[in-house]
């Protein structure tokens, strides 16, 4: 066993070790900063110069080397911390493993040193869509109940920053991407063990990175591995149930289902418009505990089907750590959705304009389309190797027309739609798309930006894409 494998605490002897961090960003810097604090000699390797990080790394005593990944096969260090953007199947990573160099992710490193201030339960959340909303919902429910909560991970705040917070926390709510999960070990001291774990839903995504649907699903399934308390799964998504059934977990772990249906014993669901818990109350065999109503959720813009599903998942996770139902209800009353997620931008002359720019895969588009009856769909971007034709087959009657954006529109030949308008690449493709959608829309229609792909071919981010849509719609409304 290497010396690194035996390091299971902030207070273990890290002094004098050397580490290479591959990639820089918020998580890479958090790893560098943490390791320097632990007395580790740190060198960060990244293919581009980052002026801001250069100065920060210099300030903490870490070196920065501009280098591409394929130049690092012979790097000589005690262990490596890799960015979640680097595949574990990358030939360079395989070569480094062959040299018996331990390879950690920021998440594994955080798990090993989680006791710096205090050790608290980790609530793990993943899913193709809705994981950020579910993490924020769960965090707000626990906080409303008086707990100190760190919502961290893929959501933006590195887990290592939460670990090092001097005040400590009662719970970590950790959002995990498939990239982060694929880097986690299944065994040994670095294997992360959540108290409660959930996969919100599952569908094809990031196939250009994972290589196959099965490998993407396998990465997602790791969220349940080693769970010590509760595995929360989606009753409306058979794949998540299979994951729980096949997971290697601690003894006496309970499986809790959630779904848009009347709940059975051990489930969270809906009865006559009331969200109910039949999983965590002692009299669950013959009664249910009321949490809130769909009517109340509607007042707070949380009543779309896919959002209610996220709410139910968060309810199950919050109840798994004995959160008071009244606290959950109050948190839901105050919760605001993140921007760019089925966000109503305008209602003008009988037409509703909805910004769902965060829908970066087909599953998210399907979830969004399920809420509307007649849609002009603005669609397109980087498709990440996923077949999108199923969307248009399934919603042929719902989609009145599709306005296609994005540089690569080759998928158009494979989709079936009543009307297709392709927007050529330009300096302002969104304004052109909004103008085209306006010509097609009639009273009763919803113009829905739900692109189904990443934004980077024409925009800086999904936020930038969504803001371009919002601005274009506002300009259109002003002119009318």
Swiss-Prot record:
Return the broad EC class.
Answer: ligase
Whether Metal-binding counts among this entry's keywords is no
Q: Does the keyword Cytoplasm apply?
A: yes
Q: In which pathway does it act?
A: Cell wall biogenesis; peptidoglycan biosynthesis
Q: Which GO terms describe its molecular function?
A: ATP binding; tetrahydrofolylpolyglutamate synthase activity; UDP-N-acetylmuramoylalanine-D-glutamate ligase activity
Q: What is its EC number?
A: 6.3.2.9
Question: Do you know which Pfam families this protein is assigned to?
Answer: Mur_ligase_C, Mur_ligase_M, MurD-like_N
InterPro entries according to UniProt: Folylpolyglutamate_synth_CS, Mur-like_cat_sf, Mur_ligase_C, Mur_ligase_C_dom_sf, Mur_ligase_cen, MurD
Keyword tags: ATP-binding, Cell cycle, Cell division, Cell shape, Cell wall biogenesis/degradation, Cytoplasm, Ligase, Nucleotide-binding, Peptidoglycan synthesis
HAMAP family attached here? MurD
Q: What does this protein do?
A: Cell wall formation. Catalyzes the addition of glutamate to the nucleotide precursor UDP-N-acetylmuramoyl-L-alanine (UMA).
Q: What is this protein called?
A: UDP-N-acetylmuramoylalanine--D-glutamate ligase
Write down the species: Tropheryma whipplei (strain TW08/27) (Whipple's bacillus)
